[in-house]
C-alpha cells in the first residue's frame, strides 16, 4: 500500500487534490456531543453507549440529505475512522458508520485502520496541525467510500484518510461526522484562503511544510489554513514558524 511517507523515522499520510470535494455532512452542529451521558464510555471503547449516543443525534432531515447525495454514486461503502484515544479506542465513529450503513442501506468497510496514534482530541490548534495520522489496510481500487468520524475540528484526520484511500486507487465521494461546528464543514481550501496563506507565510514556510508532510499548502483543509492565517495575523510569521517547528519536533520525538 502507498499513501504514506517516512519523515525522521515517522510514517505520515500523503494527501490528494481536493478537486470538487463536497462540504462535510455534519449530523449535529448545535452544540458539542461531549455533554452526553454516554460520551465518556463511548470514547473509551464501549460499543453499546456509542450506539445510544449516535441514535440520539440523528434526525430524518439530515439522513435524507445525506441519502440524496450518496445516491449519485454506485455501491458506496461506509468507512469509519478507527481512532486510538488516551482512554481507549474510540467507538463513536464505528457506531456512526453502522447506523449510516443500516439506515441508508450501504455496505460497511472496516479494513482500513489508523496505524499511528495522534491523540488529536487533547491537542491545541498547532498540535492538531503537526500530528499527522497514517493508515494501513486494503483499499479496493475503484470503490466509492463515504468516510465518517465522530467530530470534525480542522478536518486533518479525514483529509489524511482521504489521501490514503485515493492514492491506493479508491474514491472518497464524501465525508460525514456526527458532530462539528458549521464553519468546519468546508474541507477543500478556497482560492482566497490559499492566496492569503501563501502571501503571509512565504515560500520558505511552505517548503518546510512540504518537506515535513509531503504536500504543499493547497492540500490543507480550509479550517487548517484559516487557523494558520489567524495565528500569523495575531503573532507574526516568525512566532508561528517557531511554534510549528517546535511542535513538529515534539510530535516526532
Regions found by a protein language model. Name each.
Residues 36-58, 117, 121:
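Acidic/glycine-enriched edge-of-secondary-structure segments
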Residues 143-170, 174-175:
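A contiguous pocket-lining binding segment that forms or flanks enzyme active sites
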Amino acid at each position: 500500500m502507498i499513501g504514506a511517507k517516512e519523515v525522521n523515522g515517522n510514517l505520515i499520510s500523503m494527501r490528494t487534490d481536493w478537486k470538487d470535494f463536497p462540504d462535510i455532512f455534519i449530523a449535529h452542529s448545535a452544540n458539542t456531543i461531549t455533554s452526553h451521558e454516554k460520551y465518556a464510555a463511548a470514547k473509551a471503547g464501549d460499543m453499546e453507549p456509542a450506539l445510544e449516543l449516535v441514535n440520539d443525534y440523528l434526525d430524518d432531515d439530515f439522513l435524507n440529505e445525506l441519502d440524496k447525495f450518496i445516491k449519485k454514486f454506485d455501491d458506496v461503502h461506509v468507512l469509519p475512522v478507527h481512532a486510538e484515544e488516551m482512554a481507549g479506542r474510540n467507538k463513536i465513529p464505528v457506531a456512526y458508520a453502522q447506523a449510516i450503513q443500516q439506515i441508508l442501506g450501504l455496505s460497511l468497510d472496516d479494513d482500513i485502520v489508523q496505524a499511528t496514534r495522534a491523540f488529536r482530541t487533547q491537542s491545541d490548534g498547532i498540535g492538531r496541525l503537526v500530528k499527522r495520522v497514517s493508515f494501513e489496510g486494503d483499499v479496493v481500487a475503484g470503490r466509492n467510500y463515504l468516510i465518517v468520524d465522530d467530530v470534525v475540528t480542522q478536518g486533518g484526520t479525514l483529509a489524511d484518510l482521504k489521501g490514503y484511500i485515493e492514492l491506493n486507487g479508491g474514491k472518497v465521494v464524501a465525508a460525514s461526522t456526527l458532530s462539528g461546528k458549521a464553519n468546519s464543514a468546508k474541507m477543500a481550501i478556497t482560492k482566497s484562503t490559499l492566496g492569503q496563506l501563501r502571501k503571509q507565510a512565504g515560500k520558505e514556510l511552505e517548503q518546510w511544510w512540504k518537506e515535513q508532510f509531503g504536500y504543499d499548502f493547497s492540500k490543507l483543509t480550509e479550517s487548517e489554513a484559516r487557523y494558520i492565517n489567524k495565528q500569523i495575523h495575531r503573532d507574526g510569521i516568525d512566532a508561528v514558524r517557531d511554534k510549528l517547528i517546535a511542535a513538529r519536533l515534539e510530535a516526532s520525538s
